[in-house]
Amino acid sequence: MIKPLTNHGNKNIYPDNSTLIVILGPTAVGKTSLSLQLARDINGEIISADSMQIYKDMDIGTAKASQKERNIIPHYMIDIIKPDQEFSVAEYQAMVDNLIPGIVYRNKVPILVGGTGLYIRAVIEGFLFPEMDKNIELRQKLQKEAQQYGNKYVYNKLKKIDPELAKKLHPNDLRRVIRGIEVYHQTGKTMTYFKKEKQKKGDRYRNLKIGLYREREELYKRINKRVDIMIEQGLIDEVKYLLTKYPDLSKTARQGLGYKEIIGYLKREYDREEAIRLLKRNTRRYAKRQLTWFRRDQDINWFNLSTGDYKKIYSEIKKLSRDFLLDF
């Protein structure tokens, strides 16, 4: 039997294998500091839901929690692969599914924290990823066709197989286009079919979603300041080191915010000031896309951190979390 975590009035708070607290929101909104505070107060451990923090040696540009912070509260799904390796959403989902029972066994509350909506969705809703081996031969064939005839040529193949998926993808999103074709060739069923099957099953974890946001002007100021701090901390040297240590950086790592802009500068495509300007602009645009993604979800409990009374807001979040843990 799992021991109670905390006394709360006359009740006890118990973690549960199917229970998960989620803290989400755009970049630079303040997720890290709030999640650390909440984890201390409800005896939690943090699982990162950030698609860039999975990479080793990419520290400054991904704004990882410091080693000191990680020593206070255990963090997972940070520094798990090298930047020259690929990592799929399916792998992320599987690893988190394996982590949660261990966290609960230690009488801790799993807290999923991040801004990568696809990762959060994969854990909570689950994707029915077909179990199949990679078809390297087919992938190479399709990649060669894309080089010879253009991405649209391969995209049109997907359009014939899975028109619903094709509508959601840009022809230049070649990796996902090829994946859609590969799934059909390997299983005889489309990605759209697997998605619809998943939707019939409902959420995989009982969850509380806490969304953080700030007024646009304040958020953008925080983003600009964060970029300036990253540059001061040595982001340019970090990118130089990465390119030396990992000459074959994965496409995902190479295209990461803060990395693609500095890589362009190091290639002399533009000067240092332009790299910083681009990084600030691209990060602001990314934050906007994150909010657009999250606002589709009607189950998120939103908190505006721009109101000025942080103690009151945090108190509400803590109470909401405790009540959620009690109510099962």
From Swiss-Prot:
Gene Ontology molecular function: ATP binding; tRNA dimethylallyltransferase activity
Protein keywords: ATP-binding, Magnesium, Nucleotide-binding, Transferase, tRNA processing
Cofactor: Mg(2+)
Annotated transmembrane regions: none
Binding-site residues, ATP: G25, P26, T27, A28, V29, G30, K31, T32
EC number: 2.5.1.75
Sequence positions that bind substrate: T27, A28, V29, G30, K31, T32
Keyword ATP-binding tagged: yes
SS bonds (residue pairs): none
Function field: Catalyzes the transfer of a dimethylallyl group onto the adenine at position 37 in tRNAs that read codons beginning with uridine, leading to the formation of N6-(dimethylallyl)adenosine (i(6)A).
Assembly with partners or alone: Monomer.
Similarity comment text for this entry: Belongs to the IPP transferase family.
Name recorded for this polypeptide: tRNA dimethylallyltransferase
Organism: Halothermothrix orenii (strain H 168 / OCM 544 / DSM 9562)
